[in-house]
Structure formats: structure tokens, C-alpha cells
Amino acid sequence: MAPSFLTILSTDAILLDANLGESKSDVITALAQRIQDIGRSGDAEQLAHDIQAREDKSATGLPGGIAIPHCRTEAIAFPTIAFARLSHPVDFGANDGPADLIFVLATPVDGLISHTKLLSRLARALVHDEVLAQLRTAEDPTEVFQLLNGPLGNSGPLLPPAPARNNKLKLLAVTGCPTGIAHTYMSAEALEQSVRNNFPN
């Protein structure tokens, strides 16, 4: 059975306007500790190590001030997300500068499908400027939780579906990124959004 949204993220795992340090290692360590503190992991040190090991292979900074450090790990028993909106942005390797919106995603080692699915949903949601704006202006963790409930939970997509179209025009687009899978999902969502905007009928 797929995990429910309530088992993936809780308001206790959401930090707003937090100063978690000067480096991405500091941020990862702090969020791993937070995940342990709320009972989602029994080994924050191992969790931080596994996230950092994945980060060392390929930076997880994304355009727009976002980072999604992630890993598959034995330090947790079920998929978990923690979120921090940083008061002091930190460099996660994105070309456009440091990140202030940090999502840590960790799934069990035997949960490859769940890991990929969650990463896909999260990355696709974060393509949209309105989502980023709401994350940056949210006043409390509950507001963030409700915002993310769409793409991560079972309540459907964050944005309403595109209107029905006729089948006269068919478009095929292929995207891929050697940097990381999250970039690929974000590119795919951007392509789909461009088609919706430019081919309304």
C-alpha cells in the first residue's frame, strides 16, 4: 500500500525562517536531527551521512532557490519529508544562486518506486511560481502542509487539470538531465505547462 500524505510530512517537520547554518552540510545535519527528534528516524547521524553521500554525487540545488537533498536509507522505516524555509540562503549547487527552500526527502532502501514517485511529484509542483511564492509567504507550518497536500498526498494534483482538447494536434517532447532526476521532472513539467499555455485548444 502506498504511504499516505500524513505519514510523509507533518507540521512538526516544517521549519520557517530558520537559520540552520552556513553550509549545505549544516542544513542537512539539522534537518536529519529534526527528523529524528519528531520520531521519524532512530539515527540522525546515519541519515545525514546518507543524504550527504547522495549530495556528493550530484548537487540537488534547483532553479528558483530550491534544493531537494534526498536519499534512500536504512535510517528510516517509511518515506519522510522535512521542509525548511531558511532565513539565510545556503549554496546547494544551483547555477542561479543559493537556496532558501529546502526539502529533505528520505525513503527506505527497498522503496525505490515510492522515492521516485515522491521526488517527481515534489519537483513538478515546485516548477510553478505561485507555489514558490506561497511557500515564501506562508505564516505557519499548517499553511505549508496544506499547500503541499495536493502534490504529495492522495488528494489529486496541486493545480487544476488542463481543459479538454481535441485530438487534432499531438506533440511529443523528450527531456533528460545528467545532473539529477529532479531536474528532469521539473523540465517535463515546464514543457507540459508551455504546451498548455501556447496551445490552448
Cite the ranges covered by each PLM segment:
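Cytosolic covalent-transfer regions centered on His/Cys nucleophiles
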Residues: 1-201
